[in-house]
Amino acid sequence: MPLFATNPFDQDVEKATSELNTAEDWGLILDICDKVGQSRTGPKDCLRSIMRRVNHKDPHVAMQALTLLGACVSNCGKIFHLEVCSRDFASEVSNVLNKGHPKVCEKLKALMVEWTDEFKNDPQLSLISAMIKNLKEQGVTFPAIGSQAAEQAKASPALVAKDPGTVATKKEEEDLAKAIELSLKEQRQQSAPVSTLYPSTSNLLTNHQHEGRKVRAVYDFEAAEDNELTFKAGEIITVLDDSDPNWWKGETHQGVGLFPSNFVTADLTAEPEMIKTEKKTVQFNDDVQIETIEPEPEPAFIDEDKMDQLLQMLQSTDPSDNQPDLPELLHLEAMCHQMGPLIDEKLEDIDRKHSELSELNVKVMEALSLYTKLMNEDPMYSMYAKLQSQQYYLQSSAVSASQVYPGPAQSGTYLVAGSAQMTHLQSYSLPPEQLSSISQGAVPSSANQALPSQQTQASYPNAMVSSVQGNSYPSQASIYSPPAAAAAAAAAAVVPVPVPADVTIYQNAGPTMSQVPNYTLTSSTLPQTGGSQQPPQPQQAYSQKALL
């Protein structure tokens, strides 16, 4: 049995069995007895606490604990008797008898003998007698029931002298009692009575029996045994025997029996209600105003678990039932109502974000559609490149014709300094009136003005030729030819024109100038006329096309 576990009886038991006690505190002992029946585990906890003090190393504490144990057995009824007749208590008794103080062991054995006599009619409480029989077989001696040794062990003082100078031994007390008795005899012989501070020996050694003494019951008492007396609070009891400090023998209209001495009082005028009120009272003031303190509201936040729990409770509730709603349901409903504004704000935020994402989605789809459309259309830069090449060709031709150089007299070729990047040769046919001036060493002003700019010679056709001389193309425009007579006369009158130095250098440039404009006058192209020259007829304009 674990004796060192904390239980509610430890504090009271330690106070009732304190080393500093000079006498038993019967008021506290009876309070402990009353407390035993207030709980289901009260008897077991009380017995554990008492046996813990019985095993104390101080015999003074152990003797007080045995006195408390005897009082509990006498006052607490069968619920405590069953705990005393348990295996755990039997093992504790064996431990005390083997290791305890001799005085403690004698008193414990005397109590066990007394309990055996009390429990002999109840088969549930037969363990005490069996335990005594077992211990006797082991060599432990027990006093006989009602013997003088048992009475002396029970009546042995629980308090052991702590200070030899203040408390006399038992022998000294006996001597003192004898001296007092002798002095009393001498005083009776004298006429004048002499008062003394010490009680008479008869009061100490004889039983105190007061015939006709009456007491009033303070508490109700229900008899647990056949030899006990049942009474109610306020009844008058006639005391027949008060030799035992704990149990008195009394008589009422119900009969004669034993009753606890602490349940009665000698003051016949005392009211039981007043006594109870003084000891244990609970009063309430009617003027007190009861205020309900509401807890502070918790900060609201969206809790999906609570909403699900509320929905589940609402679905499981029967609306046709007349029973009131559960407090938990009302509490959850109030909390969900507090979440309403937060849920509205959350929905507005989600709607705003959804609108923004929808707008972004529309813009992305428009951009992708435009990209797909542009990828599927034909490129626009091809025609623009053709226009740029034609403009570049016209500008290059205008720059290349800035100078005119006479070629050999036989071919009438004129070289014009131009760019090395030119890939086209321009052939010009001169009219007869200009050939005569060329044979005389002079170039007509009209030719000099026409060659550099090429703006007034729009009638001269341009032919697309390759870098190899002699190739012709079917797309070449027709060249204006003067009459044969005029051409022969012009050929006879041709005079070699001196070639300037820069033209010679230009002709000797070699492969760096792969293609140059060639202005050639051939005899076959001259008109064959007699003496008159016909004015040149206008030529058809030739549309220039770039060879890509």
UniProtKB/Swiss-Prot annotation:
Phosphorylated on Tyr-198. Phosphorylated in response to IL2, IL3, IL4, IL7, CSF2/GM-CSF, EGF and PDGFB. Phosphorylated by activated PDGFRB. Ubiquitinated by ITCH. It holds the Pfam family SH3_1. The modification Phosphotyrosine is found at Y198, Y381, Y384. Keywords: Cytoplasm, Endosome, Isopeptide bond, Membrane, Phosphoprotein, Protein transport, SH3 domain, Transport, Ubl conjugation. SUPFAM superfamilies: ENTH/VHS domain, SH3-domain. Ubiquitously expressed. Enriched expression in synaptic vesicles. Component of the ESCRT-0 complex composed of STAM or STAM2 and HGS. Probably part of a complex at least composed of HSG, STAM and EPS15. Found in a complex with HGS and E3 ligase ITCH and DTX3L. Interacts with E3 ligase DTX3L; the interaction brings together STAM and HSG, promotes their recruitment to early endosomes and decreases STAM and HGS ubiquitination by ITCH. Interacts with STAMBP/AMSH. Interacts with PDGFRB. Interacts with LITAF; the interaction is direct. Identified in a complex with HGS and LITAF. Interacts with HAVCR1. Belongs to the STAM family. This is Signal transducing adapter molecule 1. It comes from Mus musculus. The lineage of its organism: Eukaryota, Metazoa, Chordata, Craniata, Vertebrata.
